[in-house]
């Protein structure tokens, strides 16, 4: 993004509009996203991306292109669902397009407004991109191995999970909430969220194994 004078100029206009709390914030975000999508990625960066894919993901046919911003998972600001990630990406061209879409999601009108309300400056926000192999899964979600409200509390592992692999990270539905106690050595479903029924015994066993692995990795 720093290589494009037009993008830098648009970022400057957006910063000024945010300082003035101007009405033009939304159209400025839309224009900035358009510029990011249409601007060609520099050759050196394309070369680095290609080398990294060959070195780490050779032979992979289907990819996930995920957002990874420093302006998420913060105290008082989770940013769940406001940045874009893309599944079922199957070509080099689509990978590059998805990377630009992830970058553009940092300056969507919604994400900019929510960060402004949380007191997070645009100057302090950056977006990384994680490219992974897409694998078949029975369910997906987010696991936290420390109490989010108390980092010194390691007694429980918290898992938000959904039978639809992408629901939790997209923030599109309320997930099941599962709690595993490392003190008691057992787990339970705290909330079903939008699900109509709980996971079966094998599903619970998988979550317990996952919680133990997460704690060991920690």
Task: Enumerate the language-model features and the residues they cover.
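N-terminal beta-alpha lobe that positions the nucleotide/phosphoryl donor
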Residues: 1-130, 139, 205, 218
């Amino acid at each position: 993004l720093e290589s494009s004078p037009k993008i830098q100029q648009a970022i400057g206009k957006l910063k000024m509009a945010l300082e003035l709390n101007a009405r033009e914030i939304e159209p400025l975000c839309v224009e900035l996203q358009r510029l990011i999508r249409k601007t060609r990625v520099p050759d050196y960066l394309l070369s680095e991306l290609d080398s990294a894919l060959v070195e780490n993901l050779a032979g992979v046919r289907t990819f996930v292109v995920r957002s990874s911003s420093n302006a998420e998972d913060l105290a008082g600001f989770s940013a769940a669902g406001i940045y874009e990630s893309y599944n079922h990406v199957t070509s080099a061209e689509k990978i590059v397009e998805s990377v630009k879409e992830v970058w553009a999601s940092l300056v969507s009108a919604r994400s900019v407004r929510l960060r402004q309300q949380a007191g997070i400056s645009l100057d302090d926000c950056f977006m990384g991109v994680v490219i992974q192999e897409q694998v078949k899964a029975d369910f997906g979600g987010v696991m936290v191995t420390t109490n989010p409200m108390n980092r010194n509390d390691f007694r429980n592992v918290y898992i938000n999970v959904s039978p639809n692999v992408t629901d939790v990270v997209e923030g599109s539905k309320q997930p099941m909430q599962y709690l595993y106690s490392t003190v008691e050595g057992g787990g339970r479903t705290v909330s079903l969220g939008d699900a109509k029924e709980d996971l079966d015994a094998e599903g619970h066993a998988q979550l317990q194994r996952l919680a133990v692995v997460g704690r060991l990795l920690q």
